[in-house]
């Protein structure tokens, strides 16, 4: 998955001297589109302060699709809403194109929010207005002339594939079509950044794939930076370039999607990604023991391949190295960002090698291999 180099006009409301000073202090800002520096957010309630975010230090690059995942209450929504200042941080800074948006007055915030589109889980369409009117409304509010509005709405409806639905009302649309209207409306001011807050969680799997395809096309054609939060790990796998994992308002893991999904390091990441993993079949798990019960007992190995060549892991070499009778009980290989990610559960019986030797041989060909136990 490759983000295009085409870029939108950067948000620029401060002087060159300040930007130069920021770039000198933080060289990585020359590349980052959105930068969080030591960001924190604390809510104050009747039972005292609750820290939603703490010590967030993170960069989102121009033109990438960046995913944020975490359990409920991890701080995902709080983080994404600091980008357009719907949430005011308690401490730290958010920079967009090297500009500290915490220093913006109300007029500059209005301009900022026009340059940052946002789509939501529940579409937020006006039921009394048709598709055309829903998309046109932000332009009308901004005082854009009628002819210019008409051209823009027509272009956007064609982009999202709804040019034949322009007179339809929300009640006449499917969930996917409503979200396409929401996406078109979010793009009316030619944003440089698009925020997606659980944008597919109310959709069925087929419609979800359709919306992801549209977001991918928008990213590639317009060069948009897309930041999304979701509880659907498959969405991150299918569309994002990089991902960050939050837990209790802290970053616990981040990296390219193929790396985090292929070999998660933190327990929270492993838990979140568990539904995508293949486990030991129940009939084998019930017979598993730490020690062999018979001379012909089979040793079970849990083997992971992460980011190997596009052709995939060399299973023939692995089976030969293990020796004996090798069976694939569960698993498979998928491709994420043009890299092969594999998870295999193998049964090895009659091998001339000891348990430790088998494990060592497996680890010469796979980044991660563990002994599950014996069957038989």
UniProtKB/Swiss-Prot annotation:
It comes from the Bacteria. Pfam families: ABC_tran, NIL. PROSITE patterns: ABC_TRANSPORTER_1, ABC_TRANSPORTER_2, METN. It is a peripheral membrane protein. Gene3D superfamilies: 3.30.70.260, P-loop containing nucleotide triphosphate hydrolases. InterPro entries: AAA+_ATPase (IPR003593), ABC_transporter-like_ATP-bd (IPR003439), ABC_transporter-like_CS (IPR017871), ACT-like_dom_sf (IPR045865), MetN_ABC (IPR041701), MetN_ABC_transporter-like (IPR050086), NIL_domain (IPR018449), P-loop_NTPase (IPR027417). One of its GO terms (molecular function) is ATP binding. Residues 1-25 are annotated as: Disordered. Its EC number is 7.4.2.11. Part of the ABC transporter complex MetNIQ involved in methionine import. Responsible for energy coupling to the transport system. Belongs to the ABC transporter superfamily. Methionine importer (TC 3.A.1.24) family. The complex is composed of two ATP-binding proteins (MetN), two transmembrane proteins (MetI) and a solute-binding protein (MetQ). This is Methionine import ATP-binding protein MetN 2. The gene is metN2.
């Amino acid at each position: 998955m490759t983000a295009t180099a085409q870029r939108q006009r950067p948000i620029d409301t401060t002087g060159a001297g300040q930007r130069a000073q920021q770039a000198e202090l933080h060289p990585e800002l020359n590349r980052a589109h959105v930068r969080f520096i030591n960001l924190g957010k604390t809510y104050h309630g009747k039972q005292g302060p609750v820290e939603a975010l703490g010590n967030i230090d993170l960069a989102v690059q121009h033109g990438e699709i960046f995913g944020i995942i975490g359990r409920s209450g991890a701080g995902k929504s709080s983080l994404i809403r600091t980008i357009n200042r719907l949430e005011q941080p308690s401490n730290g800074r958010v920079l967009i194109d090297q500009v500290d948006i915490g220093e913006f007055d109300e007029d500059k915030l209005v301009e900022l929010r026009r340059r940052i589109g946002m789509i939501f889980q529940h579409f937020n369409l006006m039921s009394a207005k048709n598709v055309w009117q829903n998309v046109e409304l932000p332009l009308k509010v901004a005082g854009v002339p009628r002819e210019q509005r008409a051209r823009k709405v027509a272009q956007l409806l064609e982009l999202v594939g709804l040019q034949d639905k322009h007179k339809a009302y929300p009640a006449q649309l499917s969930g996917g079509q409503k979200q396409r209207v929401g996406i078109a409306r979010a793009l009316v001011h030619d944003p440089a950044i698009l925020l997606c807050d659980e944008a597919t969680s109310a959709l069925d799997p087929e419609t979800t794939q359709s919306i992801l395809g549209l977001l991918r096309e928008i990213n590639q054609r317009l060069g948009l930076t897309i930041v999304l939060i979701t509880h659907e790990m498959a969405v991150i796998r299918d569309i994002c370039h990089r991902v960050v994992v939050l837990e209790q308002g802290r970053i616990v893991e981040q990296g390219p999607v193929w790396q985090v999904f292929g070999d998660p390091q933190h327990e929270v990441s492993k838990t979140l990604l568990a539904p995508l993993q293949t486990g030991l079949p129940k009939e084998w798990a019930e017979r598993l023991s730490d020690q062999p019960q018979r001379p012909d007992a089979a040793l079970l190995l849990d083997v992971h391949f992460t980011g190997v060549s596009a052709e995939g892991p060399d299973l023939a070499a692995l089976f030969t190295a293990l020796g004996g009778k090798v069976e694939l009980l569960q698993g498979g290989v998928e491709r994420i960002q043009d890299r092969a990610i594999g998870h295999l559960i193998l049964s090895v019986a009659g091998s001339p090698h000891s348990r430790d030797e088998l494990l060592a041989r497996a680890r010469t060909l796979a980044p991660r291999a563990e002994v599950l136990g014996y069957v038989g």
